[in-house]
A protein has these predicted regions:
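Acidic (Asp/Glu-rich) sequence patches and key acidic residues
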Residues: 1-139
Length: 139
């Protein structure tokens, strides 16, 4: 189970300082990057560690994103998906994996692309709403 985060970089690159800055500023979270090697690293948020892998966007990524967009009928991210040359794949331990969603949202906030997973395509704002639901499911 993963999140795929579209990135407007032609090739994946670890943007450690920017990710750490946005994690602190917008998510009140500290990210620790461990074992960086090329476009692969482990990211720790407290005791939770998730692997991320950057790669070039492929046709399956675009097809999956456009399929969801077409089903919703709003074309909200269509241009962003097409501008994104790379994708970050964020490891998840399950559907309620808060750490993985924070990591995906932080990457999306820097790389300016949507997040794809669980049959949905969404941006940082929706990710923040999902995070709020994970913290307090009984509102």
């Amino acid at each position: 189970m993963t999140w795929r985060v579209f990135a407007q970089d032609d090739a994946p690159r670890l943007r450690v300082r920017e990710w750490q800055h946005n994690a602190r500023q917008f998510f009140e979270t500290d990210l620790e990057i461990r074992d960086p090697h090329g476009a692969v690293a482990k990211i720790a948020i407290g005791p939770s560690v998730r692997e991320i892998r950057g790669r070039l966007r492929d046709e399956d990524d675009l097809r999956d994103a456009l399929e969801i967009e077409n089903a919703r009928g709003n074309g909200m991210y269509d241009l962003a998906e097409r501008r994104c040359g790379s994708v970050w794949v964020v490891e998840r331990e399950g559907p309620d994996d808060r750490a993985a969603l924070v990591i995906a949202a932080v990457i999306a906030s820097v790389c300016l692309g949507p997040i794809l997973g669980d049959g949905a395509l969404f941006g940082v704002r929706t990710a923040r709403e999902k995070l709020d639901e994970l913290v307090s499911p009984y509102r």
